[in-house]
């Protein structure tokens, strides 16, 4: 088996329906590590469910890997990878260093659980796009879909997102705040309560998603960027997940638009 230290922390570019050609940065690479354990996670069952921030990979290795990568072919640089990127304490430092190399836009995909922490918000504020996951309108659904680390509540997540929105405004940043909702059997009938939260947060954009990547029976570094044909390379059995029908997705999109008046994009094309 290849040692993780010999694998690049930078992967892709991979095609993303939301942002085009996306170069992935994996700040974790230490098994799958996240403050959530989503039932649909492309990494499979999360091996280290934690809220504790730490250094996983040195900034030096990440910048070195970045320089050796195909970053020039990417439309956007996305922090995602083998878990929750805000768990890495060098997230802010890596963003600053990459901004010295290129002016390509930077996106962070986060579950929002650590945004309550001012230091984490300071780390993400230099990104051009922050996409925050919000699948559940209450703690019961949060536990069912996202299975968070102990102590994470919907209230703390919403508070963190609102604080981030205020920071963006107060500091006059051009950072776009996107809320991403993964629709599952557990939340597809909770549109009104999700719309209520969206109206409180008032993000710049809402991205509607449904699990298009399979759920692997184990973690393998390749799962961080695997989709389409790549999923055949995952060494564990994979399970396709229940997705919404086009009709259901369109109904949800229309209803959310009617209830929120927000800018909405969807993985489902017409
Ligand atoms: S937040 Fe993302 S990385 Fe974490 S378990 Fe959910 S889908 Fe996986």
Predicted stretch roles:
Residues 2-18, 29, 64, 187-270:
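Auxiliary Fe-S-binding modules of radical SAM enzymes
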Residues 4, 17-57:
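Canonical Radical SAM [4Fe-4S] cluster-binding loop centered on the CxxxCxxC motif
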Residues 27, 79-81, 181-183:
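Short glycine-centered, acidic/aromatic-flanked micro-motifs in structured strand/loop junctions
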Residues 38, 74, 127-128:
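Short, well-ordered alpha-helix to beta-strand connector turns
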Residues 44-79, 93:
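Conserved alpha-helical substructure of the radical SAM core
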Residues 51-54, 144-151, 222-223, 238-242:
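Short glycine-enriched, charge-decorated loop/helix-capping segments at active-site entrances
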Residues 73-74, 79-81, 98, 106-107:
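Glycine/small-residue-rich loop that forms an oxyanion/phosphate-binding "nest" at active or ligand-binding sites
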Residues 86-222:
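Conserved AdoMet/S-adenosylmethionine-binding subsite of the radical SAM
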């Amino acid at each position: 088996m290849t040692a993780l230290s010999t694998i690049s922390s930078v992967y892709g570019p991979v095609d993303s329906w939301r942002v085009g050609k996306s170069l992935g940065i994996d700040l974790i690479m230490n098994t799958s590590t996240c403050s959530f354990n989503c039932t649909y996670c492309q990494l499979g069952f999360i091996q280290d469910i934690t809220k504790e921030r730490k250094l996983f990979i040195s900034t030096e290795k990440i910048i070195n890997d970045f320089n050796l990568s195909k970053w020039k072919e990417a439309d956007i640089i996305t922090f995602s990878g083998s878990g929750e990127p805000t768990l890495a304490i060098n997230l802010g430092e890596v963003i600053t260093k990459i901004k010295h190399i290129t002016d390509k836009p930077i996106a962070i995909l986060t579950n929002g659980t650590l945004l309550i922490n001012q230091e984490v918000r300071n780390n993400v504020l230099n990104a051009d796009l922050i996409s925050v996951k919000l699948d559940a309108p209450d703690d019961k659904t949060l536990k069912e879909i996202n299975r968070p680390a102990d102590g994470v509540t919907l209230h703390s997540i919403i508070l963190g997102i609102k604080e981030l929105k205020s920071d963006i405004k107060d500091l006059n940043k051009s950072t776009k705040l996107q809320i991403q909702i993964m629709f599952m059997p557990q939340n597809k009938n909770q549109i009104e309560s999700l719309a209520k939260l969206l109206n409180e947060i008032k993000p710049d954009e809402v991205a509607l998603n449904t699990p298009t990547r399979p759920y692997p029976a184990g973690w393998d570094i390749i799962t961080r960027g695997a989709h389409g044909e790549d999923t055949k390379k995952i060494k564990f059995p994979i399970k396709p997940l229940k997705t919404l029908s086009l009709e259901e997705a369109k109904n949800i999109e229309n209803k959310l638009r009617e209830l929120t008046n927000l800018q909405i994009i969807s993985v489902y094309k017409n």
